[in-house]
Design a protein with these regions (language model features):
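Helix N-terminus capping/helix-initiation residues
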Residues: 23, 90, 114, 217, ...
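Secondary-structure boundary/capping signal
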Residues: 49, 199, 326, 337-338, ...
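A short acidic (Asp/Glu
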Residues: 73, 328-329, 396-400
């Protein structure tokens, strides 16, 4: 096989340019292999294999014909059930099925197969080809995977060339290479019998992204097993119910779910499976934990419909990762069809309430700040007072800085220069300490939250916190929490804390 042929190499390079390689940095390795490849034997004289058609003393080299085995897989079931026999597999048959050469009457006459059978095989091939995604280890980049592309471009027309190659690392056991001599190999059947297929699969997926070696360990398996059992138990108690009027925490959790769907979908499409799985198992759990805390603080018992809707989306996305437990949970949720047949949840930007996400983040960060102050001061609180910004100029400066930072600038000098250049914020030069703190505040936020703030209107922080802190604040800290605007006339501010309030960063007094 003359892999050194420059025209053949160039065709392969064109294929690599057009196909998706994950991770993308491995593309250069493929092209380097194509550059140095040269002649390679297509046959050998020892071992098992298929006899070379024109010389029975030789056996076809496995890395020559086997690299297009997926073409054979499209028709293997017809071989296995006896529909196709060796004597039927003539050159004319393969020319018609794989290469679209000749016509069906010639294939029928030479193969002795009925037109119906040949149509059935061709339909199967056309359904599965081209190869959507080929997954393998990095050690095969220098041989099998490169030959896979070279042989496909040599044999098949362009529309049947491979579309994607995904390269992954190896699987380690507790940080060490698996080997019989080290005694650190767990037979697959034993592992599945002891723990089930789903925990084993998820433990491997969750241990590494593409190209990284997956460090398999039993502690991870036990943890995931417990997580799946917990999800099963949780969903067993949920019933589909009509969702009534939404409260603040409802709008937040439904909006967060839309965001999670978008994140997980993107991760799966880009083969960042570890990231997608982490979001399904843990990010959702974190969101639901906060939601449960909010609901319990208000004494609500009318959220089964919302929890059912959210966990239905979660389990549908879990299904490709852990199909067995997903089907069990899906049934517990009341569905009669299989989870694997359900539609992948669709992201809808219209269903994201940006204000609810921002306001809930404000509530969470305020609670966290109170907790941190109590930890540091060791105070047993008798009174908690929150001061929110109500200075219009400070708000205007904040919005201006926000826009500058979302635009990619975060240098203090650049920010100050742009503030001074704007007639509406030019007086900001008198408050450098405030500007520095706002920049620090925004640095700590995700790009998603900052973008939401830019796109949405301001909301009344005082009104929101006054309403929502009443329940969760009392439950968390055992005292009533007062909320003032920093410029309120009737403000209680014995220590002058109010002047430190910034948008989305209230000042706090604890007595």
């Amino acid at each position: 096989l003359n892999y050194g042929d420059e025209e053949w190499k160039e065709t392969a390079r064109n294929c690599f340019d057009e196909m998706n390689i994950l991770p993308s940095k491995i593309t250069t390795e493929f092209k380097e292999v194509i550059d140095w490849l040269h002649e390679r034997a297509c046959a050998r004289q020892q071992g098992l294999g298929t006899k070379l058609p024109w010389d029975k003393d030789w056996i076809v080299e496995s890395l020559s014909d086997s690299v297009i085995y997926m073409a054979y897989y499209t028709m293997s079931r017809f071989v296995n059930d006896g529909t196709l026999k060796p004597e039927n597999l003539t050159k004319e048959f393969f020319d018609y099925i794989l290469l679209d050469k000749g016509d069906i009457s010639l294939a029928v006459s030479k193969s002795k197969l009925s037109e119906n059978v040949i149509d059935m095989v061709k339909k199967e091939f056309k359904y599965f080809y081209p190869v959507d995604s080929r997954h393998s280890g990095r050690d095969l980049v220098q041989n099998h995977l490169s030959f896979f592309v070279l042989n496909h471009v040599a044999i098949f027309e362009k529309k049947l060339w491979p579309q994607e190659i995904v390269v992954n690392g190896s699987v380690m056991m507790d940080g060490a290479k698996m080997s019989k001599s080290m005694g650190n190999i767990i037979p697959l059947r034993t592992a599945i019998k002891d723990h089930g297929a789903d925990p084993i699969r998820l433990a491997i997926i969750s241990s590494a992204e593409l190209l990284q070696d997956a460090d398999f360990n039993m502690e991870s398996v036990y943890g995931i097993q417990n997580k799946l059992e917990s999800l099963l138990e949780e969903c067993s108690n949920l019933k589909a119910a009509q969702i009534g009027d939404l409260e603040a925490e409802d709008r937040w959790i439904l909006s967060k779910t839309q965001g999670r769907i978008a994140q997980i979908t993107e991760a799966v499409e880009k083969m960042r499976l570890r990231e997608g799985l982490q979001d399904i198992l843990f990010s959702f759990e974190s969101d639901l934990s906060w939601y449960t805390k909010r609901v319990e603080a208000k004494g609500r018992d009318n959220v089964s419909g919302i929890l059912h809707q959210i966990n239905s989306a979660r389990v549908a996305m879990l299904s490709p990762f852990a199909p067995h437990i997903a089907e069990e949970i899906w049934e517990k949720l009341g569905y009669t069809e299989l989870a694997s047949k359900s539609a992948w949840p669709e992201f809808s930007k219209e269903n994201i309430d940006s204000t609810s996400i921002q306001s809930e983040e404000l509530l969470k960060s305020t609670i966290d700040d109170i907790v941190n102050i109590l930890k540091i001061t060791k105070i047993n609180p008798q009174k908690i007072v929150i001061y929110v910004n109500s200075d219009e100029f400070k708000s205007k400066v904040y919005r201006k800085i926000l826009g500058i930072m979302v635009g990619g600038q975060n240098n203090m000098g650049v920010v100050m220069k742009e503030l001074i250049a704007d007639p509406q914020t030019t007086d900001a030069k008198k408050m450098p300490d405030y500007i520095q703190k706002v920049i620090k505040d925004l640095h700590s936020e995700s790009e998603e939250i900052k973008s939401m703030k830019v796109e949405s209107e301001e909301f009344d922080e005082k009104q929101f916190l006054s309403t929502e802190l009443a329940s969760i604040g009392k439950k968390e800290f055992g005292v009533e929490i007062q909320v003032f605007g920093a410029t309120d006339e009737d403000i209680y501010d014995p220590k002058g804390k109010a002047r430190h309030a910034r948008p989305f960063k209230p000042a706090i007094l604890i007595e």
